[in-house]
Amino acid sequence: MLPRHSLIPAACAVATLLASAGTMASSHREAPFITGMPKVDGTDFYMFNSYESGRDGYVTLIANYLPLQDAYGGPNYFSLDDDAIYEIHIDNDGNAEENITFRFQFNTERRNLAVDVGGTSVPVPLINIGAVTGQNNDAQNVLESFTVEMITGDRRTGNVQNLTKAGSGDSSFAKPLDNIGTKSIGDYEAYADNFIYDVTIPDCPMPGRVFAGQRQEGFVVNLGEVFDLVALNPLGARDSRSNVIADKNITSLALEVPADCLTGDNTVIGGWTTASIRQATVINPGPQGSDTTGSSNAKGPAVKGGAFTQVSRLGSPLVNEVVIGLPDKDRFNSSEPKDDGQFATYVTNPSLPALVEILFGVSAPETPRNDLVTVFLTGVPGVTQLPTVTASEMLRLNTAIPATEVGAQNDLGVAAGDFAGFPNGRRPIDDVVDIALTAAEGFLCGADVNGEAAGGEIGSCGSQDMQVNGGAIVNDGALPDPANYLTRFPYLNTPLPGADNVAVAE
């Protein structure tokens, strides 16, 4: 057995990890249907107590979408979907239904900027025709903006109110241009800071902050070897391989909210993100107008209508990627936590440890995996359990556990004694792949995270009521680098530029 003090981290991490017991890009292209809709593909969800200096008492929520962006991906780059809604849901009473939802909706304006060519004004094919700054976007051909609504109660029938810019009442926020290159945007970090807004949140006495825009991918994984039948040394050095998605960008929807405006009767909250699109799409065989000529008789390439229908869902990392079986991946993306009983077998009898046993001869923990059910579906008593216990998959955070300062954070989170990390919420630095692999191999079997105090029992692995496989740290060889993250909101790093022209002669 591990020392009592080291079980809490592991316990929290176990559920989330075990569920994702494999290792891969947290939720990038994880289900067959969503691979054809990258703009609404949720890739990672972070929820943690803010650790920026002076932000005690705040919770940061980050939902990432549109995976594996190449920085040079012009000429259109990576706008989000105007015909979709992107949502972050909070359950603060434990009934596996949202009590609060933050809904992001985007709007794209095409200016149809033109240049004179032989006396004829001709629209340009690029999204900018010159340098752009936070104060001057005259050369920007495509503008994105967004609104954020707070819905209390059911996401579709509850009370809807707008978040607004603090001091102005304006409910429209601008999204920065993607990082095209240093000639178009000279200092992208300073440029993007202009799009971090202080916001007034309905029924909340303190302001929050919001940002939506491109960031450097923060998830770390040795992707290719993991998916090639785990072609790596799982007990080797944690930095023996490379993070193959380190050169990718992502689009983040980031929101910072006072913790007291999220919690219910105790200090634990559950969270997840979803994206929904219109139910029907009709393709226009002869598009014209707004996307081409700017005609008043604009007819775009498609007409969309009908009710919004959920196509992406993400709470704890890696769940749909490596826990849910292939036949049910699309179903999981369309489901809600309150209905997660239908997926229970994937948690009680996970396939990943069995696959590892076949590939490496390492004995899989016995089933049923009651340890995973506790940490992953119900929360750990006294740590991440909500007032009402409803078995459901979501990321859980105890807002009363103080944030760990940047220099003291451990990327193994709770498993290494850093109780402010995964699976008590999830920070950008948390190496969820290593945590998940370790938990999957029985790290938490029979653990009691509260020692002699009441509660804290994790549960057994079948008849095994103590740690399995010696508590080894199983890893993919890709290690997070603290230098690749910001120490302030929105925490994920400045996106990589599509071109670095600093050495190009004028």
Which stretches of residues belong to each language-model region?
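N-terminal signal peptide c-region/cleavage motif recognized by signal peptidases
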Residues: S20-G22
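Hydrophobic helical h-region of N-terminal Sec-dependent signal peptides
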Residues: A11-L18
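Surface-exposed extracytoplasmic segments
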Residues: M24-E506
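Bacterial N-terminal signal peptides that target proteins for export
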Residues: M1-A11
